[in-house]
């Protein structure tokens, strides 16, 4: 294993530039965390007057942006914090990072000269104040581009055709529709822009003192890249804006080297001049690295404000639901992502109505009810749902004659369940939906393993339900900040690939010592009884039938 070892006494620095904060994580050569810091935008940079890191435009429904310079100043502040922690920057062999997906930055004509001649005696903020043609960056929360989405889909032959090429149908938050909106409505700004970066490639650009390429994984979140060819799609570019490819620059693999660290950081913070900057990527791809998802059959379920399912596959089949990105840690693999808007807030709503606003009572009710919930199926949409595309509403059904087989199953709609059934209904309903949609994307049944993360992954009752429904072991991780941890891991991986002169599987770095690293995870729930798993499969099929009917009757585009 020596040939895959990292240099002793070296560090690897990972960042996560997210919606609400900038995080930094430092790993040593054994992949153990030695330092971490956090800048919270609202509280640490209050003069920007953001709320949750963003501006919501009251005059333009759905327009949500963040001040670009806030991200720059956050980096200045982060380095002040890291310096005070006595981190020896000269030991850092590589830097990489994570950026909130889909967000975009617009560099004004002439800004490349500013980037390449940064004065180490001045903070970045002071030097980049006039570098951007748009001061406020559109971000993933923005939903003001519905017209642009439909126009792009129509131009390429429909939503399914766009999904087959780019990995996703057009979504309002994706970068392509956001660029089209600027091109159509603010042509003078578009024409005064020499480079369009994602948040990830924008931050990487600061570190190399030049425009960094967009990586394949994050580039797939734009509705602009051909995911099979890993190149810009001509038809998608033409459907979006004129002269777009020249403004986007090149694409690069996530494990590639963006460049050596800029002299600014060498002179100001005493980085080694040979420190590598590995391509930055999106937050979700970095989480895949931080959760050690790297082989087909691996699945992660993130249970947070929104719920997300990640899976690894070699043979993706993009459709009208979900997203497909090239894997950031596997040269031939892909990651599939399924997003649910109704996550912890919807579970909390059921808790508040049925469990005395107490998670202890909620868990007690969940444990008191039998698996399969006596054939009761619930659909809980406190918010407009993405997957499936359904409006706000709760729908409840009781399956009659349920014996564990699909034959003879008939459902009856009811107005309400008793509190214990409602509690189990909201948990099982979401997990059955996840299993059904993941299997459509080619997830093996059962998966090899599931890694659960997010706030609700601390709930053992929910973990047991995951194991029972999916039929595999469920693991949990030491730390919840998987994006910044994943970025530091990717920094080490990129350094190793560069040393070897080409791609190496990321697992080579930790396969014999994973349990001794900050990446280790623990078994939290064992695979469910296979007879029960089969019964869940049957009721899942019935649930899918009902879901399809609801979409036909109530579904949104």
Can you name each region flagged by the protein language model?
Residues 277-287, 307, 482-487:
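Alpha-helical transmembrane segments that form the membrane-embedded catalytic/substrate-binding core
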Residues 2-7, 260-271, 281-298:
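Conserved phosphate-binding catalytic cores of ATP/NTP-utilizing and phosphoryl-transfer enzymes
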Residues 17-19, 141-143, 153-282, 378:
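Gly/Ser/Thr-rich active-site cleft segment
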Residues 11, 23, 103, 221, ...:
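Conserved beta-strand and immediately adjacent loop positions that scaffold enzyme active sites
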Residues 77-86:
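A short, N-terminal amphipathic alpha-helix
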Residues 1-51, 57, 61-62, 69-76, ...:
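Glycine/Thr-rich phosphate-binding loops that ligate phosphate moieties of nucleotide
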């Amino acid at each position: 294993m020596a040939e895959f070892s990292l240099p002793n006494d070296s560090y690897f620095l990972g960042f996560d530039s997210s919606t609400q904060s900038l995080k930094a994580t430092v790993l040593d050569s054994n992949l153990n965390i030695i330092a971490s810091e956090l800048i919270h935008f609202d509280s640490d940079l209050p003069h920007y007057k953001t709320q949750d890191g963003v501006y919501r435009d009251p005059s333009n429904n759905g327009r949500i942006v963040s001040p670009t310079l806030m991200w720059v100043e956050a980096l200045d502040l982060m380095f002040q914090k890291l310096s005070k922690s006595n981190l020896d920057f000269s030991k850092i062999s590589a830097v990489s990072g994570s950026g909130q997906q889909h967000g975009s930055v617009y560099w004004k004509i002439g800004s490349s000269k500013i980037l390449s001649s940064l004065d180490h005696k001045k903070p970045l903020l002071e030097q980049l104040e006039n570098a951007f043609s748009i001061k406020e960056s559109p971000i993933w929360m923005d939903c003001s581009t519905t017209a642009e989405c439909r126009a792009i889909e129509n131009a390429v032959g429909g939503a399914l055709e766009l999904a087959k090429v780019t990995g996703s149908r057009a979504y309002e938050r994706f970068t392509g529709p956001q660029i089209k909106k600027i091109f159509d409505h603010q042509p003078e700004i578009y024409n005064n822009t020499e480079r369009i970066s994602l948040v990830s490639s924008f931050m990487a650009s600061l570190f190399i003192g030049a425009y960094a390429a967009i990586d394949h994984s994050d580039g797939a979140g734009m509705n602009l890249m051909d995911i099979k060819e890993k190149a810009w799609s001509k038809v998608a570019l033409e459907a979006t804006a004129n002269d777009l490819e020249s403004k986007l620059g090149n694409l690069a693999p996530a494990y590639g080297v963006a460049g050596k660290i800029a002299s600014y950081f060498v002179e100001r913070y005493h980085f080694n001049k040979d420190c590598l900057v590995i391509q930055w990527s999106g937050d979700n791809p970095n989480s895949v690295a931080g959760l050690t998802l790297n082989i087909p059959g691996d699945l992660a379920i993130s249970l947070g404000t929104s719920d997300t399912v990640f899976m690894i596959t070699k043979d993706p089949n993009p459709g009208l639901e979900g997203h497909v990105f090239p894997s950031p840690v596997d040269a031939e693999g892909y990651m599939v992502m399924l997003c649910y808007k109704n996550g912890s807030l919807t579970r909390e709503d059921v808790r508040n109505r049925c469990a005395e606003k107490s998670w202890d009572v909620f868990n007690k009710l969940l444990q008191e009810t039998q698996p399969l919930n006596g054939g009761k199926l619930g659909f809980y949409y406190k918010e407009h749902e993405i997957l499936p595309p359904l409006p706000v509403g709760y729908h409840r059904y009781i399956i009659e004659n349920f014996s564990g087989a699909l034959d003879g199953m008939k459902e009856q709609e009811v107005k309400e369940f008793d509190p214990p059934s409602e509690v189990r209904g909201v948990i099982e309903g979401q997990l059955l939906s996840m299993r059904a949609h993941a299997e459509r994307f080619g997830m093996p049944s059962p998966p090899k393993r599931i890694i659960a993360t997010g706030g609700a992954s601390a709930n053992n009752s929910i973990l047991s339900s995951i194991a029972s429904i999916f039929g595999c072991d469920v693991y949990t991780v030491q730390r919840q900040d998987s994006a910044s941890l994943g970025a530091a891991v990717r920094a080490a991986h990129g350094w190793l690939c560069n040393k070897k002169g080409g791609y190496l599987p990321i697992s080579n770095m930790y396969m014999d010592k994973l349990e001794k690293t900050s990446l280790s995870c623990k078994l939290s729930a064992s695979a469910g009884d296979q007879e029960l798993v089969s019964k869940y499969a049957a009721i899942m099929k019935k649930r899918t039938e009902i879901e399809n009917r609801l979409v036909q009757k109530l579904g949104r585009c």
